[in-house]
Amino acid sequence: ATCMLSLKYKFERRIGLYPTAFDKDGVMYSNTAFGDYPLLTPKGKVDDIANTFSGWMLLSYGKPVMASSMDSTLVPENVTDESMRTFWSARSGEPGEWLQISLEGLKEVRAIQLNYYEHRAVQHNKAMDLYHQYRIYHSIDGQNWELVVDKSDNDKDVPHDYIELREPLKTRYL
């Protein structure tokens, strides 16, 4: 399926992949529930495609956010509003800008996804020299931070980077 975004351009789209099967009458159907959440990949035939849901839930929705800066009206709270059409932008885009999300309690984090938006981009074709570099830290108390993900040397374009952690992480702040 294609998901319409149409924020930068009227035909701007994203690809959506949903579990699909045939019912007893041979009619094809898809399960789009929790369509942007992690799904289990079946290793064989599945009797009920609803069983592909991992059970992992979005922990950041509507949670408090702080940032080093913001550009114009692109407020940090946009990061946790779960809208594909809103986003946060730091004022400069230079190293040292940061964003912090409070999960408002100790939570078990199993995966992290960052979705970048091409704010103020003027490039129309794929640029091989543009890529996303970042680090993700976590903290239980908001004072002592440990590195979770290090993509500071990344040389790939990852506008929707999904990182599944090797082990679940108990944390309060990211």
What are these regions (language model features)?
Residues 3-5, 68, 115-117, 137-139:
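Predominantly extracellular/luminal cell-surface or secreted proteins
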Residues 19-21, 102, 138, 164:
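Short, well-ordered beta-strand micro-motif
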